[in-house]
């Protein structure tokens, strides 16, 4: 949300920080609430693009039901914000600790999230792209 003293980059950073914190802390209502309803998602771990936040949440619920999937924590590094008019691009490296019935695992990925300024001044995420991070 904009304030008289904030810049768009600060607002985008705040939106990104809130989204990442909600994800890391397992606050799913806050996490999914960070996305516009018609946000799209491209994940290296899924065969198709997800066409809405509801579709992504349904997939997440399936992971929980089938594998007892949960986030144990995540760390965001190498953050970059590009302010482009009414949109902002947030990219970063993310290290996520997850747990499933198979045990715990740490995954290393790169993520790009596109935010768009809404009429109320907030910056909901409208697209997320997650890629595996290579070591090379």
Please annotate each region the language model reported:
Residues 79, 96, 110-114:
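Hydrophobic alpha-helical segments of small multi-pass membrane proteins
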Residues 81-88, 103, 115-124:
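A short, structured loop/turn motif at beta-sheet edges
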Residues 91-98:
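Generic short beta-strand segments
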Residues 8-11, 15, 28-86, 93, ...:
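A solvent-exposed, acidic/Ser-Thr-rich amphipathic alpha-helical stretch
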Residues 100-103, 135-136:
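A short, polar/proline- and glycine-enriched secondary-structure boundary/capping micro-motif
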Residues 108-136:
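Short beta-strand edge/turn micro-motifs at domain boundaries
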């Amino acid at each position: 949300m904009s304030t008289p003293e904030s810049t768009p980059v600060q607002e985008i950073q705040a939106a990104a920080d809130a989204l990442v914190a909600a994800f890391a802390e397992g606050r799913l209502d806050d996490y999914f609430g960070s996305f516009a309803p018609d946000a799209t998602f491209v994940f290296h771990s899924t065969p198709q693009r997800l066409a809405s936040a509801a579709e992504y949440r349904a997939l997440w619920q399936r992971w929980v039901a089938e594998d007892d999937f949960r986030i144990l924590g995540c760390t965001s590094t190498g953050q970059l914000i590009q302010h482009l008019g009414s949109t902002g691009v947030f990219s970063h490296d993310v290290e996520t600790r997850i747990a499933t019935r198979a045990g715990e695992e740490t995954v290393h990925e790169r993520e790009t999230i596109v935010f768009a300024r809404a009429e109320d001044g907030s910056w909901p995420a409208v697209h997320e792209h997650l890629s595996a991070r290579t070591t090379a």
